[in-house]
From Swiss-Prot:
This is Protein FAM180A. Coiled coil: none annotated. The lineage of its organism: Eukaryota, Metazoa, Chordata, Craniata, Vertebrata. It comes from Mus musculus. InterPro entries: FAM180. Pfam families: FAM180.
């Protein structure tokens, strides 16, 4: 093999590795890395950075949530909805997590092929997607309920698989 061919091969493989690293960064939730210009949402936002914020997230999830016909998620409790983290919750739920069956199935397929342990922000978004899917499953009827339930099961299995991987002794050492 000539040195020119070897050089081209090395450059090509380096380009492939660089491109795949950049792609995998946003593969699960590409919208988190492409915020809309009209939003004041930071790039790749995260809700939970402390125990208090985890408790607030549970409070937001337990509050009465409303989903409009255009799939816009809002919190009915005005006091909770006025909090700064509730605004982040609203932005993440309405601009980042998938809300249509094909998008949720795509996320499940990407999770099945995801190497390693999920990042904190990806785990958080998958959990929010799981909560959204459970909510839609409860509201649906007939064949639609079965489709939403299957999506719910797929997401749950992916999260469980990630938790099992992250708690195994080989990973934690």
């Amino acid at each position: 093999m000539s040195w020119k061919a070897l050089t081209i091969l090395l450059v090509f493989s380096s380009t492939q590795a660089t491109a795949s690293c950049r792609w995998s960064r946003a593969a699960l939730f590409p919208a988190a890395h492409r915020p809309k210009r009209s939003l004041s949402l930071p790039l790749n936002p995260v809700l939970q950075t402390s125990l208090e914020e985890v408790e607030l997230l549970y409070e937001l999830l337990l509050a009465e949530i409303e989903i409009s016909p255009d799939l816009e998620i809002s919190i009915k409790d005005e006091e909770l909805a006025s909090l700064r983290k509730a605004l982040s919750f609203h932005s993440i739920c309405n601009n980042i997590i998938p809300k249509r069956i094909p998008d949720i199935r795509r996320l499940s397929a990407n999770l099945a092929n995801h190497p390693g342990i999920l990042k904190k922000e990806d785990f958080e978004r998958i959990t929010l997607t799981l909560a959204y899917t459970a909510y839609r499953t409860a509201l649906s009827e007939g064949h639609q309920k079965d489709i939403w339930a299957q999506s719910l099961i797929s997401l749950f299995q992916a999260l469980r698989h990630d938790l099992m991987r992250s708690s195994s002794p080989a990973v934690s050492s």
